[in-house]
């Protein structure tokens, strides 16, 4: 969410009960594939309580939101440096009304549901980063073979070779982490 970053307590999208509906207000940013999706899983604050130490805590719940729901819209796509095949957009909720039966799981347990889901996606993000690193290494090798300085390709210089060896070692090490 804007201004929340990774702070779960920074959640600002709220869901309030209204008869047989939930009404969502707020926004989400950097949502992967938002430009293509027709159905979204949205985490919103449903309850404000005190934790065991008496501190205010927000309890979140998960909801199914459809692109055609009234009060829901998708913002413009982000202009990203990479991973352009994935449309990353903002989601906007302005009195977005969804039926009560579209809550996923248990009220107040949406954050746990989101974390369990995100854990499964982390390997995909790591794989994308590794692919980008491998591509950058390939492009760099091609460039240093082509670029001339002092009458020869810069690939012939020992310092360039040291740097390429370091890049290659880091990419290979990353493969074992993924």
Where are these regions (language model features)?
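A structural signal for short hydrophobic beta-strand segments in well-ordered beta-sheet cores
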Residues: 15-16
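A short core secondary-structure module
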Residues: 25-74
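Glycine-rich phosphate/pyrophosphate-binding beta-alpha loops
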Residues: 2-4, 29-35, 82-83, 119-124
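Short, solvent-exposed loop/turn segments at the edges of secondary structure
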Residues: 8-10, 36-37, 58, 86-88
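A generic structural signal for beta-strand entry/edge sites
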Residues: 19-23, 39, 88
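Glycine-rich beta->alpha junctions and the first turn(s) of the following alpha-helix
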Residues: 72-173
